[in-house]
Amino acid sequence: MATADNLDTPIAKKIDLSKGKLPFKGKGLSGCVDINSKSIEEQRRYGVERLAAAYRIFSGHGFDLGLVGHISFRDPEFKDCFWINPLGYHFSQMKVSDLCLMNQNGELVYGKERTGDSAQSIHSNIYKSRPDINAVAHAHPMYGKTFSTLNKELKPITQDSCAFYKRTATFTDYDGVANGPVSYTHLRAHETRPY
C-alpha cells in the first residue's frame, strides 16, 4: 500500500498539511473561527480540519455503523481530487493525518491508505457531475436505513422534516453495491434535486 512518504506524484509533492494552521477559540467545533482563507494552504487546512471533525460528529450521532459511510471534501487547489476517510478507520477516531486524497480515477494521491471502491465511485461521480459541490456525505444510520425500506418521501410533519421535504431521492432500481461507473445511475437523482 502506498504511503504519503513514498508517493511520488506532483500533487503529493505540493501538499504540506502542516501549513495553513488556523486560529481557534475555545474547544471543540463550536470554537472554530470561520475565516476568509487567503492562501490555498489555509483553505485546505480549514477543509480537512472540519472534515475530520465531521466524522467525529457523525459518530456522535450514531451514523457510523460498521465500515459503511464516508464524507469527503473537494481539494481547493486540485479540483479533480477529494479528501476522504481511508477504508477501515472508525469515524470516532478520525484525525486530519488519517485522511487520504484521491483523484477521480481512484488513485491515491496523498495519504497512507486509499478509500474503498464504493466510496471512490460514489464521491468521484458526484464531484464529476456537480462542480458546484465541494463536500459529500454518505451514511447508513439506523433510522435512515429503516425509513428507506418504506420507499417513501419524508412528509413535512415537523419543522425539522420541512428542511428535507421534496429534497430527498429514493432509489428503486438497486442492483448492488456502487463499485464502478455503471452504478452512477443510482446517483443521477441528485443532479435534479434543488439543494
Predicted feature descriptions by range:
Residues T185-T192:
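Conserved small/polar residues in nucleotide/adenosyl-binding loops
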Residues I40, G111-T115, A169-V177:
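Short histidine-centered catalytic/ligand-binding loop motif
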Residues A139:
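Short alpha-helix carrying the canonical HExxH Zn2+-binding catalytic motif
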Residues M142-S183:
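Class I SAM-dependent methyltransferase SAM-binding "motif I" and its flanking Rossmann-like core
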Residues H123, S183-Y184:
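Glycine-rich, charged/polar anion/phosphate-binding loops
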Residues A2-K38:
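Extreme N-terminal flexible tails
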Residues E41, V48-A135, G144-I157:
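An anion-binding catalytic pocket shared by soluble metabolic enzymes
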